Amino acid sequence: MMRHLLTLFDLTPQELRQILATAQTLKAKLKQGERPAILERYTLALLFEKPSLRTRVSFETGMNHLGGSSLFLGDDVGWGKRESPSDFTRVLGQFVDAVACRAKSHERVEQLAEYNAVPIINSLTDLCHPCQAIADVLTLLENFGEVKGRHMVFVGDGNNVSRSLALACAMLNIQFTLARPDGYELDQPWLDRILAKYPNAKMNQTADPIAAVQSADAIYTDVWTSMGQEAESIARRAAFKNFQVNEQLLEAAPKTARVLHCLPAVRGEEITDAVMDGPQSDVIEQAGNRMHAQKALMIQLLRPEWIAENIRV
């Protein structure tokens, strides 16, 4: 059966741990100058409807490290414009071995998976951002060795990033708290789906960020206004003004707490320069972990036998 990664629900907790262990192994090898050509002769298509820095570069560089190749497909290919979605998708699958898709709507990625005979990777949609969440928990794992029982606090919106992060935390037995203004909660259908799959998950939402971070192992934030929400920017700035990750908030947290941000950041809004560039920040390392996490994910989808033979969890 063809494997896709549309959401983290497509992975088991054991598979997620295997991906994390593989990412750690590949990262260690790269630091030693080793680039095992595990995906030699494989080609990845990057099909993007939205602009990107980290996602595009991390996938392209990661595929290069693994001995494979990649090609970028932008608006000029006419996805959904010049021919039927099923024709476009099935033809694309004749030329490449996998597709990483960054789409405006999650339905577009589901459509790709419905018609395609190669693995589809959701590299960002309006619903969720699974690749980011894998990099996030990889960063937590690097800091603490074991993530079970740790506490992740997301200060911000119940958006695509926090949806995937909440699910990743449930899969790995990490407590998850969303600190947000009223009206910006995680949607109940998503929470219900997580709790139906992982009934022992510890998940909370609060409008008090100071209280939320007092037992935090990681404090995570994101922009207050995402792409496509520009018309809401004034209302959002007003709603989130007391949810900035700043020095005052960090003082309420344990000294060992790490600071995360998926980037790009609007410095001075959701996070201050002092915190983002401070000693507790792992933001840049977290961004770099996108590549290592995605390399491991591509191996999981394209050559799972390599992980079975070489990685122990």
From Swiss-Prot:
The keyword Coiled coil does not apply. It catalyses: carbamoyl phosphate + L-ornithine = L-citrulline + phosphate + H(+). Disulfide bonds: none annotated. Its EC number is 2.1.3.3. Carbamoyl phosphate binds at R102, H129, P130, C131, Q132, C262, L263, R290. One of its GO terms (biological process) is citrulline biosynthetic process. It is found in: Cytoplasm. L-ornithine binds at N160, D222, S226, M227. Its main location: cytoplasm. Keywords: Amino-acid biosynthesis, Arginine biosynthesis, Cytoplasm, Transferase. Pathway: Amino-acid biosynthesis; L-arginine biosynthesis; L-arginine from L-ornithine and carbamoyl phosphate: step 1/3. PANTHER family: ORNITHINE CARBAMOYLTRANSFERASE, MITOCHONDRIAL, ORNITHINE TRANSCARBAMYLASE, MITOCHONDRIAL. This is Ornithine carbamoyltransferase. It comes from Rhodopirellula baltica (strain DSM 10527 / NCIMB 13988 / SH1).
